[in-house]
């Protein structure tokens, strides 16, 4: 039974949800994913979390130890390989830096707003882990800004309105 490490940055931060989905998974520690930002993509309404490279940004994560049965359950939940792909990302933990498996959204899907229940699940995970929810709230705001820019690019608006979040 080969175990591996997996990082959660979205709804899988919620330990109650993970206990139901992956009963043998265990939290190892928290960490930081430097050089990435949290965003919401997939649809304008009901978007889901992903991380994308961005110099200077960082995303708090939980590092989980998972077994093959947990990984199969995560594959189903994450829509692997169609919605998410598996990627090894460099995570900084107290014990140092290490490449850890993460699910990262495939393709260029549209930006959007997460469903309230999905957002609340992530917020609960942030609170339980002691993470600053400012990162989560900034991710929602940035995703909304990008969604609106996709619908009506700022240069086409000629300054006729200004969005403030």
Language-model segments: which ranges?
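Glycine-aromatic micro-motifs
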Residues: 1-165
């Amino acid at each position: 039974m080969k175990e591996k490490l997996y990082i959660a940055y979205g709804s899988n931060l919620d330990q109650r949800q993970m206990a139901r989905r992956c009963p043998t998974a265990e939290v190892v520690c928290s960490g930081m994913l430097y050089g990435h930002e949290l965003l919401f993509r997939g649809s304008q309404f009901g978007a889901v979390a992903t991380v994308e490279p961005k110099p200077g940004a960082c995303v708090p994560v939980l590092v989980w130890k998972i077994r093959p049965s947990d990984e199969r359950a995560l594959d189903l939940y994450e829509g692997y390989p169609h919605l998410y792909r598996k990627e090894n990302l460099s995570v900084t933990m107290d014990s140092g830096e290490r490449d850890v498996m993460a699910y990262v959204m495939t393709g260029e899907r549209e930006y959007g707003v997460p469903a309230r229940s999905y957002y609340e699940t992530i917020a609960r995970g942030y609170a339980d882990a002691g993470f600053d929810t400012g990162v989560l709230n900034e991710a929602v705001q940035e995703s909304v800004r990008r969604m609106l820019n996709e619908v009506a690019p700022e240069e086409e608006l000629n300054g006729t309105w200004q969005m403030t979040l």
